[in-house]
A protein has these predicted regions:
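Alpha-helical, largely C-terminal catalytic domains
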Residues: 1-193
């Protein structure tokens, strides 16, 4: 029986709401810092819109992975991937594990299973989620003003996520197009000097 008592639901939603105020490293096309919630929202849209490329995918599971993947950052904030250490990952996992353990059944077990599957990255859904997570960040960087990029991002836009898309021709093609957009953006910046 899937039921969450209303007070617990409001408590969970209040914690999740913090992601609206947790800034990510990247900027939006409008010039403000993107929030973790916005990243998760668009990642989920991406998963929905590419799902027809994967007829055997469990779409509900994939969408859930995308929705919950950064909930731990409600406790720790966002640490950019190029700065995140094992200690940062352990801290986020600790807070998330403690929080999820307080969920009522069956939500607790389902979320624990989803996080485990995402971490192990052995299923199609976990592979798609992780590839899209990387791609969404790259797309957002392309949509931001290049003046917000830090020097290392010029290289990251060429390489980040390459190791996550190889299982899919479609996602490889998407990664290639995102890289081409990055190259055009960099070339345009160079021609404006």
């Amino acid at each position: 029986d899937r039921y969450m008592e209303v007070k617990k639901l409001l408590e969970v939603l209040t914690t999740a709401e913090h992601l609206k105020d947790v800034p990510r490293h990247c900027y939006t096309s409008g010039g403000r810092r993107e929030s973790v919630a916005e990243h998760s929202w668009r990642l989920t849209l991406m998963a929905y819109w590419v799902s027809d490329e994967f007829p055997e995918v469990d779409l509900e599971k994939l969408l859930k992975m995308c929705l919950i993947h950064d909930l731990g950052e409600a406790f720790t904030g966002d640490v950019p991937t190029f700065e995140k250490t094992e200690k940062d990952e352990a801290k986020e996992a600790h807070f998330l594990t403690e929080w999820v353990a307080k969920f009522p059944s069956p939500f607790r077990e389902e979320m624990q299973a989803l996080y485990s599957e995402m971490e192990e990255r052995q299923t199609l859904e976990a592979h798609i989620y992780k590839a899209l997570d990387n791609l969404e960040a790259l797309i957002q960087h392309n949509e931001s003003d290049i003046d917000t990029w830090i020097p290392l991002e010029y290289d990251l836009q060429m390489t980040y996520g390459n190791d996550k898309v190889g299982f899919s021709k479609y996602l490889t093609a998407l990664r290639d197009e995102v890289r081409n957009e990055s190259k055009r953006k960099i070339a345009q910046k160079g021609s404006m000097k």
